[in-house]
A protein has these predicted regions:
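Conserved phosphate/pyrophosphate-binding and hydrolysis machinery centered on Walker-type P-loop NTPases
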Residues: 128-135, 168, 172, 210
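Short glycine-/polar-rich loops that comprise or flank the Walker A/P-loop
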Residues: 29, 41, 70
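A contiguous, well-structured pocket-lining segment that forms one wall/lid of small-molecule binding clefts
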Residues: 151-181, 188
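Short beta-strand scaffold segments in enzyme catalytic cores
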Residues: 42-46
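N-terminal phosphate-binding loop and flanking beta/alpha elements of the actin-like ATPase fold
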Residues: 1-33, 47-63, 173-216
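Phosphate-binding glycine-rich/basic clefts of nucleotide- and phosphate-handling proteins
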Residues: 47-161
Length: 217
């Protein structure tokens, strides 16, 4: 067996969450599991709970979108203008390449791009962003700002590793605007789920980091 196991089953995330919820539910009931993660959103309609009974996954739905879509929108709207987006002749896709740290081909494209012909101050800022760890630090700043704006009305993030005097400011309204595209897709999916269900579920089980965001709830 693999690593000492004779048999291994892989479960999709909402099915795994349904099994977890099933283990803690004494009475039999229907539930809708909504798993809003970083890169994907998954929904499962299940019958769970009850002593000695097995959970039943009736149907599942999904989106190839999640929290990273909000990160990208926030980065493009508030971080990348400091690197020349919208105010230079640099093609837009270079800023997307820099922002998407989860996409290694895009990261390679950004790091091999020459910016010697870009006007100041963007040339120096982009070259600093290309240094080891630059795009990762920027992404962590974007993600941190998203989390802070979920709890507070305003946020400021210093970009001292790019320029000692450089910083980004954003408001809760800016975060709501950055989430609009993702929330639109999520709303459409939820309507599809609602139309497909024979009756309203007895409970709703939220899981995944993005499910805790107030603008998602």
């Amino acid at each position: 067996g693999i690593a000492g196991f004779d048999h291994i089953d892989f479960l999709e995330e909402p099915a795994a969450a349904a099994l977890h919820y099933h283990a803690s539910s004494e009475s039999r009931h229907s539930t809708l599991v909504l798993d809003v993660g970083g890169g994907t959103t998954d929904i499962a309609h299940a019958q769970i709970g009850g002593r000695g009974e097995e959970p039943v996954i009736h149907r599942a739905w999904g989106l190839p979108n999640g929290g990273t879509d909000v990160d990208l929108a926030l980065s493009m709207a508030h971080f990348m203008p400091l690197f020349g987006k919208g105010d230079s002749r640099i093609p837009m896709h270079h800023f997307v390449d820099a922002a998407m740290v989860q996409d290694m081909p895009r990261q390679r494209e950004f790091h091999k791009r020459g910016f010697a012909d870009v006007e100041a101050p963007y040339r120096e800022r982009l070259l600093s962003l290309q240094r080891d760890g630059g795009t990762t630090r920027l992404y962590r700043g974007v993600e941190g700002m998203k989390i802070e704006l979920s709890a507070h009305g305003k946020s400021q993030h210093a970009l001292e590793y790019i320029d000692p005097a450089l910083s980004v400011q954003a408001s809760r309204d800016d975060l709501v605007t950055a989430s609009e595209s993702f929330l639109g897709r999520l709303t459409t999916l939820l309507q599809e789920v609602r139309d497909a269900l024979p009756a309203a579920p007895d409970s709703l089980f939220l899981t995944g980091g993005m499910s805790r965001a107030p603008y998602v709830q």
